[in-house]
Amino acid sequence: MVIDKKKVKNRTPYFLNRIIEKSELREIIEVVFHKNGIAKASLIADNLKEIGFGFATKAGISISIEDLKIPPNKSRILQITNQELRKTEISFKRAEITTIEKSQKSTDTWNNASEALKDEIIKYYRLTDPLNPVYMMAFSGARGNLSQVKQLVGMRGLMADPNGQIIELPILSNFREGLNVTEYLISSYGARKGLVDTSLRTADSGYLTRRLVDVAQDIIVREIDCKTNNGITFSNIQNNEKIIIPLYKRLIGRILADDVKNPITPQVNIASKNTLITGNLIKEFKKNNIQKIKLRSPLTCQSYRSICQKCYGASLSDGKLVDIGEAIGIIAAQSIGEPGTQLTMRTFHTGGVFTAEFSKPIKTLFEGVIKYPSNLKFHHVRTRHGDDAIIIEKSATFDIRTTQSERKITLETGTTLLVKDNSFIKKNQVIAETSTSGRLITEKSTKDLISNSAGEIYFSDITIEERVDRHGNLTKISKQHGLIWILSGEVYNFPMGANLVVQNSFEVNKGCLLAKALIKSRHSGISRIRCAANYYAIDIILGTVTIRNANLYKDSKLFNNNYLLKTSNKKNFVVKALVGQKLSHSDIIAELIDDQYLTNTGGIVKYVNLKLAKTHKDDSEYTLSGIGYIFFIPQETHQINKDASILLANSGDYVNKNTEIAKGVFCKCSGLLEIIKSNNIIKEIIIKPGVVYPVSNNLSTFTNKIFYPGEKIIDNIVTNKIVYVEHIKLINKSCILIRPVNQYKVSNTESLFDFVTKGENKDLISLKVVNKSFFKDGEVIKSVKGVSLVNIQLIFYTKPSATAVTTKMEFVKDLDKSTNSTSEIKLRITATETTKIKYKQQKNIISQILIKEGQYITKDFPIIETLFLSRHDGRVVIKSNFKQKNNACLIIISPSNKKEIYINKKEHKLKIGDFIRVGDHLGTNKNFKSPYSGEVLDINDKLITIRIAEPYLISPGTLIHVNHGELIRKGDYLALLVFDKIKTGDIIQGLPRIEEILEARKPRETCHLAKFDGKIYVHYNDKGESLISLESQKKEKYVYILRLNQRVLVQSGTEVTIGEPITDGLINPHEMLEIFFEYFLTQTSPIQATKASFEKIRLELLKEIQQVYQSQKIEINDKHIEVIIRQMTSKVLIQERGDTTLFPGELVTINQIEKINSAIIAVNKKEAKYKPVLLGITKASLNTDSFISAASFQETTRILTEAAIEGKVDWLKGLKENVIIGRLIPGGTGLISLDNKDSIKMRLALRHKKNFLNKTFKKKNNKFLNKTY
């Protein structure tokens, strides 16, 4: 191309006097890149960098403390906000709003204040200091954003706690002013939340990328053109009225699937089919206002297991048509997965600061009186702030009559109108709200209503519905709005059995006796009074067990400083229980120190004439009863887990004591060697002492049998002692092994101790000496070391009836009557009934002990008396206790619970028993308002007396925990408020939502979809609940039942199309696919119905994914998402096999089922029935044709097992399976262009000739070579 330098010189340069920001810079470089190539673009970028840094250096731009200027209007904004909050607080005290509505109003008020301050910051900097470094950096897009600037010079605002809940106390300070201690602590929540979120999301994002790569790794560009006529019609991606991605942004690098006609002259084409869309072509489309364009797409590409060049379009790296062999599946997976971490980076960069964008306010630009149109269709609702409002069912125009003229304002369907008919509205007043999203996600949430004061419950206008669940639990639910009043008073709850000494309406003074309670003994016994750390303990000794014939000693050298119990017959027991420790049934008190049952090695245990019973504490422990013997057949067992190569002896060898049988393993006794191995690993080495005798016949009937002295084992072998005979085989010869038996006698141990039992209830407790063993009859003890076969223990037993009895072990000194001195210490078990009294008692509760030390007490004898005194002066009102019917309770209405309001009797119409609320107009004078809420007790000529009360508003569906007339204390739970909470953006958007879409999960809160084309009719009842019916022209009718507080998106009488959402919530893609498939199945063949329904669902999934990424300002090209969605929507589920070889429940591709059914129909046989299925990326990866790829992803064992059983063949079409096998991957863009075939043939011929010459002639004969050549 020849450039005329004269023309360039003579061209007049443009001069633009405007600020160039980040977006403009991006646009400049993009235009230069596309028009002049990469070299010029790099040069321009370098020049811009030089200019930028040069002028930044000259200007000396840097942030200093002085640059952080706080708008002077901040204090005024905070003042207005505090006034609003005071109004909210008054509304709550008047019970006009619930605690939830108060919380939401408070949150929204602070959020609005924060937004107003943000606008003020922009205005302030723009007007007063446009060259401020902070302002320039943030608004040019160089560094920082508006949220961060707001925190620097505005206010941090509301913060989210670690659970995502909003902390109602906002941070009013900014970083310039500095935070106080409370604000700093609240601030730290958000900072930590940001760090935790980022780290968790990074891991989630990595796993999402792995799944995406796995599902799309075999998508490669394998051909130039699939010759399809199909395509997808593209338009703007919108959410309600808001355009998320404009059409022209989606077109670059795509190929047209159809001719684009000129709207004015249809016979003229703007662009023809299969044209690559460039920037110039987009300008033409904009010029002609083209709103819909049909494009080639990976979703409609007919290439098998790949995508063609034309359907994919241009590569995003260079703007040219994608190369053959490009692994576009991997690129798509990385393009979607990588921004995953950025989806929640917003939380990190704004430090967890909360922002809400659930509704968009509509403000008036003028003041006047609003007038409703006469034909207005609406229904009443209660807003989230507790205000009465209406929702407009059909769009209408409202008149606003100003002093000068009449203005009109049009409000759309679904708008919430906040002002009443004929009411005066101010300029910039919020008169209505519209939802920013058509499908807000709500979730059920609850909040406890807790009383702020003590008093008596009074229900006003509450209708309760009682429900009993399957477990018999009663639940009380309010059916409408109502009030729970707490009438103030001092509440007294008395324990069970307390007797009131006052009557109803008694006037009492402070310190008067109200009730008394007696604590009586439940058993007979001797009293004992002990002084503990901060209480008196009154013990009634019920019974004792003392060991008479044993004394206690302490030996610090032996038994870890434990006490020894020495009996008169020289037996030593070590005490296991602790002094003063509370004992339970079957606890071990002491254990005999004895080695009479100790073995040298392990072996086999056999019991003779002994009964075994499991102990209730431990299943592996047995109690031995009776007199008998334990026969123990010794054998040494080494349990090792090592390779068989370490063995130094063989199984069947006879080894002597201390022989090394394996490396580092020595035997303790002589005997026959038995080695147990598994997979050439030694598990056990067993040495069995005894004598081996060869025998001729099979003596398996004699094996594992005990023979006594004098018994004949076999011919010529008679035993003279107890032996154990075992049948064995040595080198295929039959033998018997006669093994020695050790005999242990088990005798009666009951006579070891002499127990002395005292007390009237002595049968409650007892001590017994018991023989215990850890081995059952016939058990093989696998051990090298010796074990104790029997443990003789002293056990404590108690009766089940002794539940309220405390039993402890005590050491008591025995008094020698002859010398009157204590010489010996005895062990005693004492059972007591214990009652405690604190030293430091409450002022109004006095307890006194009625018994003396050592006094004999009979059953039901009073031991403690407690007196309950009044803390206040006042009138007594006795009530029944709802929670514990046998307990008495009362309330005293003291002078502090009453207030007097001076007002003339003639000026009001109040009656005794009426309830008034704070702020109520009491008389004819409208300026005179009640300063208190309460119940009218008395009316005089000049004043009224009220009992102070607190009202609480409850909403329908509230779970009520209290009863009318019940007495409650401060902090008691009154009710559980149930409400619908809108999920915050962090929860419904971001990575979890992307994962939900790509894994094709059913959303929790789904919307209702139109089942067919028709008209929607919405019916409302008195409570504002809606019922929807859909009616078609074919007289079809479908009724939808809505969830509580589910919003309807369409107005009554509106025409809706099939699959259109008619209520709020997320779309269930599986339901949408089913609806469209059933509809198209009535219109066309199953294969066409499948393709058509897939096309609908694909567009919806594309829109949903783009909405999530765009909400976080992340741009992803449509074609990447289309590649992944193609993999998710390529299978059908077999329902009936027909005459095919397929099975019901099997997943096959659309291409496969189309070919199979075509072949079956051709031979007049029954085709298979199927339906389209939407697979999540994980399921799609596991159902791929390549079992090697699927097995390397998840469920390896199952996939490989199924592949082996079914005899599957992997054709190694994808990248992953080839990498695993170690083959060359079927991808890469280095393919040779085969356009000039003649030149390629000539080069190949010359190369072949040269190679032939080099191999044939190796002699240094240049002449000959030259001649030949």
From Swiss-Prot:
It catalyses: RNA(n) + a ribonucleoside 5'-triphosphate = RNA(n+1) + diphosphate. Zn(2+) binds at C226, C301, C308, C311. GO terms for molecular function: DNA binding; DNA-directed RNA polymerase activity; zinc ion binding. Binds 1 Zn(2+) ion per subunit. Its main location: plastid. It comes from the Eukaryota. The keyword Metal-binding applies. Keywords: Chloroplast, DNA-directed RNA polymerase, Metal-binding, Nucleotidyltransferase, Plastid, Transcription, Transferase, Zinc. CDD domains: RNAP_beta'_C. In plastids the minimal PEP RNA polymerase catalytic core is composed of four subunits: alpha, beta, beta', and beta''. When a (nuclear-encoded) sigma factor is associated with the core the holoenzyme is formed, which can initiate transcription. DNA-dependent RNA polymerase catalyzes the transcription of DNA into RNA using the four ribonucleoside triphosphates as substrates. Belongs to the RNA polymerase beta' chain family. RpoC2 subfamily. This is DNA-directed RNA polymerase subunit beta''.
